[in-house]
């Protein structure tokens, strides 16, 4: 069990580092954020299975729902930006 926790923590930190180092494409940044959300979901499921409290049972489903909504919004933003600018390079975006 400790190896699984350490693997999830390490994967989460690697994803944060990849997100901070990634400065080129919007799609890659959104994939890093989605990976972080899936890791948090896995952690919630693992830690809630150890504690049998009823009040924390719906939390993984709520997190998964919010993550799916965020992914849908991110994908629609990528489509809109690609249609207007022709690519998804972050350096070409001037959001102001």
Swiss-Prot record:
Enzyme class: translocase
Membrane topology category: Multi-pass membrane protein
Chief location: mitochondrion
Gene transcribed to yield this protein: MT-ND4L
Location within or outside the cell: Mitochondrion membrane
Protein name: NADH-ubiquinone oxidoreductase chain 4L
Superkingdom of origin organism: Eukaryota
Function per UniProt: Core subunit of the mitochondrial membrane respiratory chain NADH dehydrogenase (Complex I) which catalyzes electron transfer from NADH through the respiratory chain, using ubiquinone as an electron acceptor. Part of the enzyme membrane arm which is embedded in the lipid bilayer and involved in proton translocation.
Family: Belongs to the complex I subunit 4L family.
Keyword Cell cycle on entry: no
Keywords per UniProt: Electron transport, Membrane, Mitochondrion, NAD, Respiratory chain, Translocase, Transmembrane, Transmembrane helix, Transport, Ubiquinone
Segments passing through the bilayer: 1-21, 27-47, 61-81
């Amino acid at each position: 069990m400790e190896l699984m926790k350490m693997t999830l923590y390490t994967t989460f930190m690697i994803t944060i580092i990849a997100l901070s180092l990634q400065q080129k494409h919007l799609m890659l940044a959104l994939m890093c954020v989605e990976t972080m959300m899936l890791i948090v979901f896995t952690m919630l499921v693992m830690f809630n299975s150890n504690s049998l409290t009823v009040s924390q049972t719906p939390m993984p489903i709520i997190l998964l729902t919010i993550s799916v909504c965020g992914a849908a919004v991110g994908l629609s933003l990528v489509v809109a930006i690609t249609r207007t600018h022709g690519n998804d390079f972050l350096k070409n975006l001037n959001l102001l």
